[in-house]
Amino acid sequence: MSGPCSAHRVPPIGPRPTIRSPRITRSSRMTEPKRPSRRGTTRTRPAPDSVGDDNPYLDAPASRASSESRSESGSGLSAEGSGSDAPRPRRPRQPRRPAADAESAPTAADTNDSAPAPTARRGVRRTTRSAAAGTDVSSSTSELPRAESPRSEPRTESRPEPRAENGSETRHESRGGSSEGRPSFRDPSPSGYEASMERPLADRPDAPNRYDRAFDRTDGPERQDTRPERPFQQERPFQQDRQDRHERQDRPDRRDRNGRRRGRGGRPDNRGPGGDRHQSTGPAADRSHDRGPDRNNERAFDRPERPDRQGESSDRFDSQDRGGNRQRNGRRGRNRFRRGAGGNESAPISGSHAPSQGSPSAPIGVEGTMAGWFDPSRDGGFLRRPENSYLPDPTDPFMPPALVRLHQLRRGDRLEVTYGRDHRGRYLVIEVQTLNDGSPVVLEKRPDFNTLVASYPDRKLTLETGRPAKTGPELTRRAIDLIAPIGYGQRALIVAPARAGKTTLLQAIVEGVSINHPEAVLLVLLVDERPEEVSEMITWGYGEVVASSFDMPPKRHVEVAEMTLERARRLVEQGKDVVIVLDSITRLARAHNTVDRGTGRTMSGGLDATAMQKPKAFFGSARMIAPQHGGGSLTIIATALVETGSRMDDVIFEEFKGTGNCEIKLDRSLADRRIFPAFDIATSGTRREEKLYRPDQLEKVHLLRRGLHQLPPQAGMEWLIKRIAATTNNDSLLDGL
């Protein structure tokens, strides 16, 4: 057999050394012809030129590799021999040679001992393959019998050393497919060491090529003898995790993320739907083919295993079966959405947020019964007690929203309820027994107070009691009935300077209403008054006293007044007569000016422009309801302070001056002379008083008033007091004129 390979054989000299891979420098590697591009091409094996057809095991790649090795060793044979201009074909897989063959084969490494140390890994690998090919050719040409097939040779000592050759073979086979006469990387019938490498990937043909590269990489020949072999038979947990990830790439919510994914080193990751990487183009693809075969292999085995991620991937895959719920469990079973263990929505919630089992929702027992006024809140309401002036207290029982809706409760309704305690120890209303001293069912269709039609009073509130009137309250009551009579639904304003006797006047009115008109509901409202006057009024025992003394905050004054007004409105809706005695409306307006949120526009005296809205609404609620509209009345007798030296008090009085239909003015000069009652007869009076007097009394009252106007205020009041003390009642006084 003739050819360049057989003509340039070098006989062995001396003892036969072991086969060593030749080492070349960067300059020698630069002379190597450029490898053709492998992108999108189908590689074919060209016919051998220099080797005869009778040796099928020797092909052009081996011949060319041998000639390259001889040209680099300085033998004089040109590298441009046969087949140098043809495209570089795929190299055959070089089997591990037994020790006997290695001793009989000539070596080409002796001629290259003077070559410098390798500077790059690519040159080392190519030279190694060339030298191996040249050695095989020389040995095959020296022996007339053909060499045995690589598949028939036993691989008995291939454990610690074949990493470079196997790595290069695996790399070429995984990229370009298998050539004729040798099995591919995914050959279903491998044997020995190759079978152990290919078994996990053969079981999963759609596994990503990332693992192919991980098994192919190496760090060069210096690690071939020191690194022990790692088992490939068992499948690692992270491989199963990555397989599950690729199986879920067809989900709609993952497509955008795959499109934006980047590979290692900033290169785009071109994995397809099945996990296989598309064939890359450009210089990045060439660099990826020239990368060290075992680099990824080292990283894959040096990276610590994460056994907990296998459960994580299975949990994510199982989440697709729960109606598309895309919950993502964290590592070690942590759930991002804080559901049950393993992400199950139906798992019971544990911890401090879990509802207590068997906790009672109803009161434990009945504590007793109580009466109070209903004060609504956002959810339900509370029952305010009279001993606290119907103000909030921690012991007030709570009214459930169901009872509020059932009985259509409104603020100010008087209730008698049965209450108990819930599981937290709070007071809770169990049952409503009475509503406004009647059945709760009867009051379901009551009218609204704002829809009631107001009219002038036509029924007189007689204050005269028939008691001796030498001095004291009876004298005051009889004087009021003659000068400024008060009727049901009257809006009376008592204009009183300081120390003019307004408190005594109010006490006389309260006593007369309580004695003469017990059917009327009397409410005494004391706002910002002296505590001793509050105590005296309560001790007196006439009417129901609701008070807030001056040592209380302004907010309490406002709350007390609003609750009292709402209570009076609820009674009027039922057709009852209510009388409110307020002391004083000036202090109430001051409290609203302090508490309410103003607009920033102030009148003289520092009074806000909107501070008088609620006090006016309070005073304007007094009205008499005609019988055809349901009847009932609300009478308000309020005091207004004047001559206090405060400009604000004067402005408040001017605001109320034209709102009342009855006005009683007290004279400070008469009070200084100890003349009581100190009425200013000329400025006191009642509008539409003809509706309150009998026809026979009306003319006599006009005659009396004309006579009193002719006298000075002091003399006229002194004369009237003497006439009242001389008579037993007003009828006898008028008859004596």
Swiss-Prot record:
How is this protein organized at the quaternary level? Answer: Homohexamer. The homohexamer assembles into an open ring structure.
Q: Which family does it belong to?
A: Belongs to the Rho family.
Gene3D superfamilies (UniProt xref): Nucleic acid-binding proteins, P-loop containing nucleotide triphosphate hydrolases
The superkingdom listed in its UniProt entry is: Bacteria
Question: What does the UniProt record say this protein does?
Answer: Facilitates transcription termination by a mechanism that involves Rho binding to the nascent RNA, activation of Rho's RNA-dependent ATPase activity, and release of the mRNA from the DNA template.
Q: Could you tell me the keywords of this UniProt record? A: ATP-binding, Helicase, Hydrolase, Nucleotide-binding, RNA-binding, Transcription, Transcription regulation, Transcription termination
Report domain Rho RNA-BD positions.
367-439
- From start to end residue, where is composition biased (Basic and acidic residues)? 145-175, 196-256, 266-279, 286-324, 376-387
Pfam families reported in the protein's UniProt record: ATP-synt_ab (PF00006), Rho_RNA_bind (PF07497)
Which organism is this entry from?
A: Gemmatimonas aurantiaca (strain DSM 14586 / JCM 11422 / NBRC 100505 / T-27)
Q: Which GO terms describe its molecular function?
A: ATP binding; ATP hydrolysis activity; ATP-dependent activity, acting on RNA; helicase activity; RNA binding
* EC annotation from Swiss-Prot or TrEMBL: 3.6.4.-
UniProt lists compositionally biased (Basic residues) regions at 328-339
Enumerate the Gene Ontology biological process terms: DNA-templated transcription termination
Q: Which SUPFAM superfamilies match?
A: P-loop containing nucleoside triphosphate hydrolases
HAMAP family in the cross-refs: Rho (MF_01884)
According to the UniProt record, where is the region Disordered?
1-396
* Comp. bias regions, Low complexity: 16-28, 62-86, 101-111
Q: What is this protein identified as?
A: Transcription termination factor Rho
